[in-house]
């Protein structure tokens, strides 16, 4: 049973670093073991394993651009709508609470759709689900541009969110397919950073379009843009799911999973399509619509999703409140309201990109420390067990205290960033309440946003690390928490502002988020043991 346990656990992506370090044995120990041998063993020829991914650095750059372009239309659909909330309110003769419902339903379906569509992406492949998602979104945008009643707006906003929202989770899956853990933080950060351009500049774009051509122009813009995005995805987005295309060198059997770009000779040569690495194909993932609920059973995952979800909810609530406050308290035009979203947007973009680069640096630093520590522990165990290499290897592989702490590598700075963003949002709320100069409101909005979305990169990268074969499903669960909590707070925003004013609302949200961040200490101390135990239970290993 011990041997079987070792072979199974070794296959877990969570143990990648352990496998790496086991390959580089201490030179002194190797010399000692060599002295005990009495027979000369002829060395076997070295077999070079195929690379984790055949996608070149330049091709990965293309993937980043395409994923970000697709994800852009998911993030912008929410932000581009904020400047016209007051316009929609007047157009359909509804109150502030009802116009906020159009934002709430968008977040609800933005959370629900990826939770289930992620399973299709993990089993049927990334490419088909992305193409279907864009088509649904394209149709919904045309419908919204032609909508004549409030009810039509509500229904089509639901369809719009359900259509495009899965691509955010699928993009994380694509990055997980083509990257190693050492480089993943940077790539996830870049994709998330460019995706968030929609949130960063969506309000500005929406304000410009609506002030010039009316509120319907924003949906025509989204329809035209998503149509172009569909053509680009259809032509160049390859299938990356490893049970379908391996490391990228295996041509998918289904034509739905084949990108036309693969017929180009340079691409075929680069990906080794004529000499595929079949050994990199993973076992097929069965479609299981209940898989998200199994992921949510994990204690450590629920903690991570709660903390990240509350932070994201506070960020989106601040964006919604900003539109209302600027138009009603500062009496700004739609175009000026859009400009006021720039500080938040630019700081959000900077924070996500910098957070991704930090993750790569911190991962390398902690991995180097871990390998040195493990080398010393291995040498000590060899002395205690008469240089029995196999026994020592089994001990290390089956004791969680010897595993690399991926939670520390990904979440170490999160507590500080959460406290800073919560403080910034609290100050932002009180600036609006006391009608401070507009510059003060925008400075606090930018400061809070600079630290707010770091947790997005930290949590997404960690989720991809923990669920390498179910990345879209797992990221969809994270998205569910974020969007449902956002919907709850935005739905209650107008009532809360009536009772507590903006200052009280954001003080409450800041206190809630800061308090929840304390739970991260559980993950830093016990996360790797919880994940190790969960993985063994999933594999049926005692």
Curated annotation (Swiss-Prot):
Keywords: Cell membrane, Ion transport, Membrane, Phosphoprotein, Potassium, Potassium transport, Transmembrane, Transmembrane helix, Transport. The modification Phosphoserine is found at residues 21, 40. Pfam families: MFS_1. It is a multi-pass membrane protein. The chain crosses the membrane at residues 68-88, 101-121, 128-148, 150-170, 188-208, 217-237, 301-321, 334-354, 414-434, 438-458, 473-493, 504-524. Signal peptide: none annotated. It comes from the Eukaryota. The modification Phosphothreonine is found at residue 38. GO terms for cellular component: cell periphery; plasma membrane. Residues 1-67, 122-127, 171-187, 238-300, 355-413, 459-472, 525-542 are cytoplasmic. Residues 89-100, 149, 209-216, 322-333, 435-437, 494-503 are extracellular. CDD domains: MFS_Tpo1_MDR_like. The keyword Cytoplasm does not apply. Its main location: membrane. GO terms for biological process: amino acid export across plasma membrane; copper ion export; potassium ion import across plasma membrane; transmembrane transport. The keyword Transmembrane helix applies. GO terms for molecular function: monoatomic cation transmembrane transporter activity; threonine efflux transmembrane transporter activity; transmembrane transporter activity; xenobiotic transmembrane transporter activity. It is found in: Cell membrane. Disulfide bonds: none annotated. Belongs to the major facilitator superfamily. CAR1 family. Multidrug resistance transporter involved in resistance and adaptation to quinidine and to the herbicide barban (4-chloro-2-butynyl [3-chlorophenyl] carbamate). Implicated in potassium uptake. This is Quinidine resistance protein 2.
């Amino acid at each position: 049973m011990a041997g079987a346990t070792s072979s199974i656990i070794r296959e877990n992506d969570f143990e990648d670093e352990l496998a790496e370090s086991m390959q580089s044995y201490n030179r002194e120990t190797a010399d000692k073991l060599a002295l005990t041998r009495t027979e000369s063993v002829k060395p076997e020829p070295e077999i070079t394993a195929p690379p984790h991914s055949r996608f070149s650095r330049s091709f990965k750059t293309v993937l980043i651009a395409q994923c970000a372009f697709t994800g852009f239309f998911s993030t912008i659909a929410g932000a581009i709508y904020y400047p016209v909330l007051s316009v929609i309110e007047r157009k359909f003769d509804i109150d502030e609470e009802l116009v906020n419902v159009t934002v709430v339903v968008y977040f609800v379906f933005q959370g629900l759709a990826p939770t289930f569509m992620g399973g299709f992406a993990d089993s049927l492949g990334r490419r088909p689900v992305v193409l279907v998602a864009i088509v649904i979104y394209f149709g919904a945008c045309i419908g919204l541009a032609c909508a004549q009643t409030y009810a039509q707006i509500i229904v089509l906003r639901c369809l719009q969110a359900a259509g495009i929202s899965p691509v955010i989770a699928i993009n994380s899956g694509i990055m997980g397919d083509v990257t190693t853990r050492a480089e993943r933080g940077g790539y996830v950060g870049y994709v998330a950073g460019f995706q968030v351009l929609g949130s960063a500049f969506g309000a500005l774009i929406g304000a410009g379009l609506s002030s010039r051509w009316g509120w319907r122009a924003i949906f025509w813009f989204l329809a035209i843009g998503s149509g172009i995005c569909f053509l680009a995805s259809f032509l160049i987005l390859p299938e990356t799911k490893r049970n379908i295309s391996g490391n990228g060198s295996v041509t998918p059997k289904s034509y739905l999973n084949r990108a036309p770009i693969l017929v180009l000779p340079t691409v075929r040569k680069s990906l080794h399509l004529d000499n595929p690495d079949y050994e990199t194909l993973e076992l097929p993932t069965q479609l299981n619509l209940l898989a998200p609920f199994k992921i949510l059973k994990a204690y450590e995952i629920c903690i991570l999703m709660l903390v990240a979800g509350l932070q994201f909810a506070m960020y989106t609530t601040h964006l919604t409140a900003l539109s209302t406050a600027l138009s009603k308290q500062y009496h700004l035009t739609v175009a000026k309201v859009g400009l006021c979203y720039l500080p938040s947007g630019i700081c959000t973009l900077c924070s996500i990109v910098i957070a991704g680069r930090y993750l790569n640096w911190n991962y390398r630093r902690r991995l180097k420390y871990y390998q040195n520590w493990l080398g010393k522990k291995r040498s000590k165990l060899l002395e205690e067990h008469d240089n029995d290499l196999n026994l020592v290897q089994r001990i290390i592989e089956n004791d969680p205290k010897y595993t690399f702490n991926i939670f520390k590598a990904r979440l170490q700075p999160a507590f500080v960033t959460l406290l800073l963003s919560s403080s910034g949002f609290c100050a932002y709320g009180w600036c609006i309440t006391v009608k401070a100069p507009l510059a003060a409101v925008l400075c606090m909005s930018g400061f809070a946003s600079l630290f707010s979305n770091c947790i997005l990169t930290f949590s997404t990268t960690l989720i991809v690390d923990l669920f390498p074969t179910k990345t879209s499903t797992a990221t969809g669960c994270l998205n569910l928490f974020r969007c449902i909590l956002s919907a709850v707070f935005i739905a209650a925003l107008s009532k809360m502002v009536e009772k507590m004013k903006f200052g009280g609302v954001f003080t409450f949200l800041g206190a809630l988020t800061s308090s929840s961040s304390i739970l991260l200490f559980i993950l830093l101390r016990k996360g790797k043991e919880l994940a190790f135990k969960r993985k063994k239970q999933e594999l049926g290993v005692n």
